[in-house]
UniProtKB/Swiss-Prot annotation:
Cofactors required: Mn(2+)
Pathway connected to this protein: Carbohydrate degradation; glycolysis; pyruvate from D-glyceraldehyde 3-phosphate: step 3/5
Gene: gpmI
KW Isomerase (keyword) present: yes
Reactions catalysed, as given in the entry: (2R)-2-phosphoglycerate = (2R)-3-phosphoglycerate
Active site: 73 (phosphoserine intermediate)
Residues annotated as binding Mn(2+) 1: 422, 426, 493
EC class of the enzyme, as a word: isomerase
Protein name, entry field: Probable 2,3-bisphosphoglycerate-independent phosphoglycerate mutase
Complex formation: Monomer.
Amino acid sequence: MKLSKKYTFRSRKVLLIILDGVGYSPKGPESGNAIAGAKLPFLNRVWNQFPTLHIQAHGKAVGMPSDDDMGNSEVGHNVLGSGRIFDQGAKLVSNSIASGDIFNGQAWKEVIGNSKKNNSTLHLLGLFSDGNVHSHIDHTKALISQAILEKVPKIRLHILLDGRDVPEKSALDYLNPFETWLNSLRKSGTDIRIASGGGRMTITMDRYEADWSMVERGWKVHVKGEGRYFSSAKEAIETFRSENPKIIDQYLPSFVISDNGKPVGKIQDGDSVVFTNFRGDRAIEISLAFTEKNFDKFDRGPLPNVLYAGIMQYDGDLKLPERFLVAPPAIDRTLGEYMASSNIPQYALSETQKYGHVTYFWNGNKSGYFDQNSEEYREILSDVIPFDQSPEMKALLITEALEKALNENKQDFYRVNYANGDMVGHTGNYLATVQAMEFLDGCVERLWKTCEKQNIVLLVTADHGNADEMFQLDKKGNVEKDSHGNPIPKTSHTLNPVPISILDPENKIRFNSKLSNPGLANVAATILDVMGYETPEGYHPSLIQNES
């Protein structure tokens, strides 16, 4: 890291606050903008009176295939922490399928070869939608089509219902045409069926070890075939909805498809299993359950001897899983790595739901520390409840811990993620999201007062939108309503930009408003600029206006 010679007032300490899921929309609360609907005396003052820009946080600006693709916390923190844009999992897998490279790779050959050699089942397990945040249904269909071409004897599908990155009750919109397609494959002689499933926030897709019981519930239905039996996934979904009309897809209970009283697709010795999610955070725990010899998170029972692969590798440091179909993005020279190599003290803090984002994803999908002597990571455990029941989440404890760290003044760079806007936003509960935002307003104000006292520059931004659009909108931007005239909740991320504001106790630093198409990739250089360091080669430029 080289000190910059351009500026006289730099060499400042920095706090970066990431308000997860807090995008910018000019629309009002009547359109589902929970940020506009909240009373935010401090944040509104920040956005209106302090230097503020709106920067891109979706689509190609964060490495997604197109500008129709939402941003998400994983890619957002990758870009924030690396200062550059890398092709992300969605694009890498799509490109590999289009080129055929995925099917010419060693891992795919081993997956198919194992099933053919043992005359066994190929199991495909993953999120079942086209949300393109964790997975895409087209990837699953491509794997199925290729497996049939290569004459795999039997295919079983274990579907995790979304309703989070897509409309909250859209499961049958994906399932019905998919089952029609499967039926045509069966008529052509393919032994293929859905075997199990459930909502993504009920089974299998836990992250950051927040709730291993989710993974255990998934294990029971996918592997053991233990659970409530149904003749089809459609019957399961319709039954659960009739029993609880308010339930949304992500919280649907687990189910097992049976035939004559027996599960149609238990995972057994000799089978091949591919996890079809490309995003890592919610893929790691189920991958450990399939591959870890000394596993102690729950009783797996007799562990089936299977050949397991991920569509991508989910943790490069842990080599998890060892077998993967597409290589993940190779993110190097991150801001955290540069700072650690120069012995610049860093502090990272969040609650469990976003802790991995300010560490693992920020550091380019790398676990652990670069240099434990100069880095301090702090996790505050999240509650295991639906977050609209407690919209403040752990924001108060985070604020108190960060105030303490700022007052101790041991580090030069601090980063924190407040999960509320995203995690409460994902519940689709507009009023709870308003409450979450109002609680955050006071937290950010407290931190600014501490920064003023310690002469620390404060940057406030977000990784993507969510709370800014809580109702489904039609193509004309009008709110879509249900049969009772109520707005249809939206639980997914948005395509909106995010604000970034700079609060300088010395009131010297200004943004360069003439910079073309700024995005999250500009934030890393901005941090270094304020701290008095030159921008590393290849990084997107700083947002700071040069001194005249």
